[in-house]
UniProtKB/Swiss-Prot annotation:
It is a single-pass membrane protein. The lineage of its organism: Bacteria, Pseudomonadati, Pseudomonadota, Gammaproteobacteria, Pseudomonadales. Signal peptide: none annotated. InterPro entries: FMN-bd (IPR007329), Ion_transpt_RnfG/RsxG (IPR010209). The chain crosses the membrane at residues 13-33. Part of a membrane-bound complex that couples electron transfer with translocation of ions across the membrane. This is Ion-translocating oxidoreductase complex subunit G. The modification FMN phosphoryl threonine is found at T179. It is an enzyme of class 7 (translocase). HAMAP family: RsxG_RnfG (MF_00479). GO terms for molecular function: electron transfer activity; FMN binding. The complex is composed of six subunits: RnfA, RnfB, RnfC, RnfD, RnfE and RnfG. It holds the Pfam family FMN_bind. Keywords: Cell inner membrane, Cell membrane, Electron transport, Flavoprotein, FMN, Membrane, Phosphoprotein, Translocase, Transmembrane, Transmembrane helix, Transport. The gene is rnfG.
Length: 211
């Protein structure tokens, strides 16, 4: 009787063991599949966000595959960040810089700033902020078109004094009841243009005779 019981217990143990292995394997495959889908969704979201900044037809490469690692405190970074180089016919056409405005009303404002190779602004988008709903959040494109007022601007258009909100005798509108937020964004975008102008050849990978 005991040998029969032992064989039965062993058989049950083997069955349970195989079931457990199969279950673990299935869970692992499911987790791997889920992680793959999440990664793909995140990549697609990044592609869409970057594509909003540059006009269609201004580049023909995959932006996420052309990253430039930056260590740039001038752009408000405390750690290395990724910029994205746009190419057209294998020539640099624009660069998207990650920029942080540290002096928003409620904290840091995180931006993406697209700059054409000739130094004109292609576009600016807000990645994240904690500004006051109904006031400072008008920096979001979903809330107003204010962020589009940067498009086509450059270091020389407007001039140095013009890179400020109108309350500070500059060219850019502020919001009713909220001046600090747009002031911080204008300052950060202007800083991004200065950084690009200073490091243009290095950022775009140009030889000296192409500068």
């Amino acid at each position: 009787m005991l040998p029969e019981i032992s064989r039965s217990m062993l058989k049950n143990a083997l069955v349970l063991g195989l079931f457990a292995i199969g279950t673990v394997g299935s869970v692992a495959l499911l987790q791997q599949g889920t992680a793959t889908r999440i990664a793909a969704a995140e990549r697609e979201a990044q592609v869409r966000a970057l594509a909003e900044i540059l006009p269609a037809g201004s580049y023909d490469n995959h932006l996420l595959d052309n990253r430039i690692e930056l260590n740039a405190p001038e752009l408000g970074h405390r750690s290395p960040q990724s910029a994205y180089l746009a190419l057209k016919g294998e020539q640099p056409s624009a660069l998207i810089l990650p920029v942080t405005a540290p002096d928003g009303y409620s904290g840091a404002i995180h931006l993406l700033v697209g700059i054409f190779a000739d130094g004109r602004l292609a576009g600016v988008r807000v990645l994240g902020h904690r500004e006051t709903p109904g006031l400072g959040d008008k920096i979001e494109l979903a809330k107003s078109d204010w962020i589009r007022s940067f498009e086509g601007k450059s270091l020389s258009d407007p001039n140095e004094d013009g890179w400020a909100v109108k309350k500070d005798r500059g060219e850019f509108d502020q919001f009713a009841g909220a001046t600090i937020t747009p002031r911080a964004v204008v300052k950060a975008v202007h800083g991004a243009l200065r950084y690009f102008d200073k490091h243009r050849a290095q950022l775009l990978g140009l030889a000296e005779d192409e500068q």
